[in-house]
Structure formats: C-alpha cells, structure tokens
C-alpha cells in the first residue's frame, strides 16, 4: 500500500500537473476518478486537463509542458527523452510502448487473459478461441495470458487478429470474422481482448446465426457498461481497475515531485473480477443434469450448499454425479463447490473491508478459521496477505 504524502508540505505551492489522459473512453475517465480520489485525501494540485481522445496530440503536450509533473497515456521514446531532459516528474499509464525508461503503471494484462480463461473453463468449455488486434501490445499480452491458461488446462486455442482501423476495413474484417467463426469447433468459449472486439465478435455471430451463449460464449475486457449493454446479447467482461491505476499514479507522481524516486519501473494492477452477462452465461457440457448441477452450485454454494444438497435437488446418486463430473469436467462436485466459494472470498477480499468472519458467512463457510484453512490450501496464500496484495482501495 502506498504511503500517504504529508499534507503540510509547502501548502503555499500547488504543483502544476498535466493530466494527459483521454476523457472519451470509460477507462480514461476511471483513471481520472482515481487521481481525483487521491487528491481529495492529500495536498491539492493545479491541474491542466483537456477533453480529448486517446491518440490526440493536444498538440504536443508532452514536448511543451513546463510544469512540475505529468501523468500521460501517450508517452513515446521521443517525448520521454524530452521529459528527462527537462527533469520533469512523469508517470506513464500507456499500453502501447512498454519500455520507455520511466515509471509505468498499467493493467496486468496477462492476469486479465488468465481470468477470462478461468471463467470459460469453469463453464465446461473444451474448445477455445481468442479475438484481438494485431500490432497492439496490450492485446498481445492478454492473448498470451489466455492461451497460457487454456494450454495449461490441456486445450488448444484458435486466434483471430486484425488491425484496428476504420469503417472500410471494418466491413472486410466482419466478413473474415464470420468465416473464422464458421470454422470453429462448437461449443466454443471466445475471449475478445477488449469490449469493442467483443462487440465485433457478437455482431459476426448474429450474421452467422450462431446461438450465443449456448454454442458461442464470449467475454470481453473493460466492463464498459454502455458498450456491453449495446451488445446483443449483453457482453460479459473482465473488470480491470483503472481507478486504482489513477490513484497509484497520482501518489507516485506526488512523491516524485518531492524527490522520492521509485525503485521499480513497472507496477501492474490486477483485474477485479468478471461481470457475467448473457453472452457467457452458459455451461458447455453435453449432459443436461451435469449442467443443472453446475448452475445449482453457482447459485447455492455460497449459501452453504453441500454435495448432498445437489443430490437432493437433482435426485441422482452420488456415484453417478461423481462419475459424470470427473468424465465431463475432470473435477469432483465438492471441488466445484470449493471453487465457487474461494472465488467469492477473493472478490470480497479485493473489493471490501469486511471482516474475515463476515466474508466467511457470505462465502458459505461456518467459521472464518476453516475458511482460512481452505483458502490457504486452495490458493497457497492467506486471506490477509491476498487482501493486502489485491485490495481495491489503497
């Protein structure tokens, strides 16, 4: 957790800080919310901010700014040289140029890809695909995380990539997307490396009359509620943590303007979880009874449901359920219950300040001590250490 800057430091001087962060995208606005939250708790700055899109030049703000510091999403090798020449405190939040020699704070893209894979694997998918953008570092890293997790589980992954471009290329791209979708083995779980790509994929599915999510489950990234809601069906999405990125960036810039330089050149902020919407809300198992068991466990595990409760609900024998779970999912019903409970624990540890006793109750454990034992066994980490490493509020 970042140390809070002493509010008494030179209150007569408000540092002049430029915020070169796009206001046209939800991600950028949430970064600015994190900066704002930091400033409300610490000394104020004199802020220079213009509304603009990612990629606009402002013009040439990075080359012309002569204030005390800058937070930017658009750093380049050339602009960083000039910032260093002027000895200007700077934090880079961009996801295009990864190695510029200044502090970079960004989303943990590998972890985002892994989280998307876990979401689809938990739903029983055994065929996987990834749709991203060529030439985009962040998309490449998310793809790597997704494929790595899928490969570790023993499966392969088909990849579709194309450049980010305008309407003319988009029309050609949609045609190729339809052809790619047509060739995939179904049912298939598809990871789109951002919500915009997820919208492209769902639109292509509609053109091909593919059943979503039963035959083609899709998950994106960014949790842009407007864009996800415009999709048909609504798009599931991995939730990054741009507010924390903004908070961290403001804190580090404040310290740097006081001469405290960071020892690390990269800080990666993990995702918060998955917002499940209709596009991936399905279980890709051929047996309807096993699918019903999975849905029951998802809905009731955190109420304390046991394997016996599953058996009573479905009216099947324990041996039948155990055998078919292992055949179709390669895990036991009890392991599935624990998996759902641990995911709930992680979510509450990351995003709330609730006590372990309260978290245990909300995750379906009778005692916090037993929850801690199970959490340590399943994750290799204690609840307290996990919370300290992943908490949303700093």
Predicted regions and their residues:
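Residues that mark the N-terminal boundary/hinge immediately upstream of a DNA-recognition element
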Residues: 306, 332, 355-357, 367, ...
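Binding-interface segments
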Residues: 371
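A secondary-structure capping/hinge motif
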Residues: 325-333, 374-386
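Bacterial carbohydrate/catabolite-sensing allosteric modules
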Residues: 1-69, 78-307, 311-313, 322, ...
């Amino acid at each position: 957790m970042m140390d809070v800057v002493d509010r008494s430091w030179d209150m007569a001087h408000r540092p002049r800080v430029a915020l070169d962060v796009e206001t046209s995208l939800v991600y950028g606005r949430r970064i600015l919310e994190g900066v704002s939250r930091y400033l409300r708790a610490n000394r104020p700055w004199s802020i220079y901010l213009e509304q603009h899109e990612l990629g606009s030049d402002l013009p040439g703000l990075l080359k012309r700014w002569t204030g005390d510091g800058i937070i930017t999403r658009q750093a380049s090798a050339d602009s960083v040289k000039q910032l260093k020449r002027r000895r200007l405190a700077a934090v880079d939040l961009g996801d295009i140029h990864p190695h510029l020699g200044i502090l970079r704070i960004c989303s943990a893209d590998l972890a985002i890809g892994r989280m998307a894979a876990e979401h689809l694997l938990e739903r029983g998918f055994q065929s996987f695909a990834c749709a991203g953008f060529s030439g985009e570092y962040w998309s490449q890293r998310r793809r790597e995380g997704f494929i790595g997790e899928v490969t570790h589980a023993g499966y392969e992954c088909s990849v579709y990539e194309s450049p980010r471009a305008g309407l003319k290329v988009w029309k050609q791209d949609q045609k190729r997307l339809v052809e790619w979708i047509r060739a995939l083995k179904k049912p298939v779980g598809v990871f789109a490396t951002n919500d915009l790509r997820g919208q492209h994929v769902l639109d292509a599915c509609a053109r091909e009359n593919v059943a979503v999510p039963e035959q083609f489950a899709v998950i994106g990234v960014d949790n842009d509620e407007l864009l996800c809601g415009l999709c048909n069906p609504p798009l599931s999405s991995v939730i990054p943590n741009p507010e924390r990125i903004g908070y961290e960036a403001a804190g580090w810039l404040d310290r740097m303007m006081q001469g405290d330089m960071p020892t690390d050149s990269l800080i990666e902020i993990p995702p918060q979880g998955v917002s499940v919407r209709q596009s991936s809300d399905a279980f890709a198992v051929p047996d309807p009874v096993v699918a019903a068991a999975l849905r029951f466990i998802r809905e009731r595990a955190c109420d304390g449901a046991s394997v016996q409760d599953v058996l009573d609900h479905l009216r099947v024998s324990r041996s039948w359920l155990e055998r078919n779970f292992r055949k179709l999912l390669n895990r036991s019903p009890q392991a599935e219950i624990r998996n759902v409970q641990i995911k709930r624990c992680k979510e509450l540890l990351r995003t709330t300040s609730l006590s372990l006793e309260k978290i245990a109750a909300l995750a379906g454990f009778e005692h916090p001590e037993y929850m801690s034992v199970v959490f340590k066994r399943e994750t290799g980490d204690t609840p307290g250490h996990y919370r300290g490493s992943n908490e949303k509020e700093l």
